[in-house]
Amino acid sequence: MLTNPSQVIIRNQDSLSQHKVLVLNHEADLLPKALLDVAASVDALALDYHHYLHLAPHANSKLRCYFGHDLPHQDPLEREKYDTVIVYFPKAKPLAPYLFNLAANHLVPNGQLLVVGENKGGIKSLVKLLPEYFATGMKLDNARHCLLFGSSLEGSAPAMKLSDWVSQYQLTTPQGEISICNLVGVFSEKRLDLGTELLLSHLPTLSGRVLDFGCGAGVIAAALLKAQPSLSLECVDINAMALASCELTLAANGMTAKVYPSDGLAQTTGKFNGIISNPPFHDGLASTTSIAQNFVTDSAKQLQHNGIWQIVANRHLPYSDIIAAEFGQLKVVADNNKYKLYYFQHK
């Protein structure tokens, strides 16, 4: 089953006949595989690890699948070139210029750019957002509550450098000053959000192997290592830009941790002495509640004897019931008008 944006691309796939195609920021469907009906070859870069895992089993000699903030093994001066680059307009609008720059660095001169997105997702402003090295965006289709725009590479784009897309700032935490590196598209308020502040203000003493689930830009990870530098810390997230941000944050603070993608806890192994998180479960959608349920269930299985589990969660959502069902007795260590801090120790 194709998502609505992917269906719109299929409606317009004739322009891809025998093209070498790059798909950026694709969704959890098999659109890149379907394009092989007309395209000569397709490379697909997912920025969401779940989307990558959905497509990766279908890779073959004509379909290469990647996860990350960039294609791997690229010479900055000699990037691989494509006849067409398809960009799925990102949910995090600040990520759009990054994707356009990446697309331009991979297009042949006058190569075709296609941008697709849902009407409610910000794509209506595409013409204003396209950099000057692209021709004016033209609306090609309007269907399935989505828009498809086309353009072509007319000028020379700046070379792709990750450092151009980072904002770095100092953050005061209960553990002290830390330096945060935030890439475009990663959540940041340039101050401690209320949930993270609540968690860090009541940080337990940990030891051994600790997991930071949904690490984002690495705020919790850096604060943890600032207070307890001997921890063997692992940081997981589903988002490529978040993982790259976390790595940059740790490096900026002279810290080390194992940073890697995981769909929920599926890619983690073994048991942890501590699991700490301000998980991205604050919107109350059914799909998000399901992810929260899986996280709670799976993390309970991966907690060592005497291990500590502490997460902050939106007090207005039913996560306390989910947590209580899995852990039984647990403490609400602290709360404010928006969040509760849950604590459990595996006895």
Swiss-Prot record:
Location(s), subcellular: Cytoplasm
Catalytically driven reaction(s): guanosine(1207) in 16S rRNA + S-adenosyl-L-methionine = N(2)-methylguanosine(1207) in 16S rRNA + S-adenosyl-L-homocysteine + H(+)
UniProtKB keywords: Cytoplasm, Methyltransferase, rRNA processing, S-adenosyl-L-methionine, Transferase
Record keyword Nucleus present: no
MF terms (GO), sorted A to Z: 16S rRNA (guanine(1207)-N(2))-methyltransferase activity; nucleic acid binding
EC number, as in UniProt: 2.1.1.172
CDD domains linked to this entry: AdoMet_MTases (cd02440)
Any one cellular-component term (Gene Ontology): cytoplasm
Stretches that traverse the bilayer: none
Function description: Specifically methylates the guanine in position 1207 of 16S rRNA in the 30S particle.
Assembly and oligomerization: Monomer.
Family: Belongs to the methyltransferase superfamily. RsmC family.
Protein name: Ribosomal RNA small subunit methyltransferase C
